[in-house]
Amino acid sequence: MQKKLDSLLKAAGITLPDRQKQQLLGYVGMLDKWNKAYNLTSVRDPQQMLVRHILDSIVVNPHLQGKRFIDVGTGPGLPGIPLAIVRPDSHFTLLDSLGKRVRFLRQVQHELGLTNVEPVQSRVEEFPAEPPFDGVISRAFASLQDMLSWCHHLPAKGQGRFYALKGVRPDEELTQLPPGIELESVVRLQVPELEGERHLVILKAN
C-alpha cells in the first residue's frame, strides 16, 4: 500500500511528509475495516480507495482558499478527511446526517490524532454557520443548484466560496447560477489511474 500511494503521489506531482502519508494509509485501513460492517463506500478494494478516495480528494488542496471549511454530506469523510490530513493548519467541519458515518469519523479523528476536524451529525439546513465558513466543499450533491440551495447560509458573504467536485464539466448548470453567485473558475483535475473526467467548480458567494 505504501508503494502504491508513493507511486500515485509521484504521478500527481504531490509531495507529502511521511506522517501525512501514514495518516492517509491509516484512514484507508480504517475505511476498509469499518466498510465490511457499516457499508460506508461502494469501493471495496483498498488499492482503489487510494485512487478514488485519497488522490481524488487531495488534488483539490492547491485550489482551496481560507482556513475554515465545511464538507457537506461528507459520508465516510470524503473529501474532508484526506484534505484535513494534508492541510493541518486548516479546520474542517465534517457534516453528515447519518449517525454511523459520524461515529466512524469520530473514531478516525481519535485514532489518527486529527485535531483539525469536527464531525457533526446534522441535516445541512439545520446547521448554523456561526461564524460562516471560508469554503463549502462537497462531492455529495447531484447538481450545483442543489448545493447552492441547501448550503446558501454556510459561506461568508463576499469572500466565501463553494467548491463542488464534479465529473464532466457541468456547462449547462453553470448557465443557471442564481443571483449573488459568481463563477470563479472550473479546474480540470488530474487524478492518476482514475477513469473519466474530474472537475472542481469554484463559485464565489457575493
Curated annotation (Swiss-Prot):
Provide the GO MF annotations for this entry.
rRNA (guanine-N7-)-methyltransferase activity
What Enzyme Commission number(s) appear in the record?
A: 2.1.1.170
Catalyzed reaction equations? guanosine(527) in 16S rRNA + S-adenosyl-L-methionine = N(7)-methylguanosine(527) in 16S rRNA + S-adenosyl-L-homocysteine
* Localization: Cytoplasm
**CDD domains reported in the protein's UniProt record:** AdoMet_MTases (cd02440)
Kindly list the positions annotated as binding S-adenosyl-L-methionine. Answer: G73, L78, V124, E125, R139
Q: What does this protein do?
A: Specifically methylates the N7 position of guanine in position 527 of 16S rRNA.
Q: Which family does it belong to?
A: Belongs to the methyltransferase superfamily. RNA methyltransferase RsmG family.
Matching NCBIfam families, A to Z?
A: rsmG_gidB
**Protein name according to UniProt:** Ribosomal RNA small subunit methyltransferase G
Native source organism of the sequence = Serratia proteamaculans (strain 568)
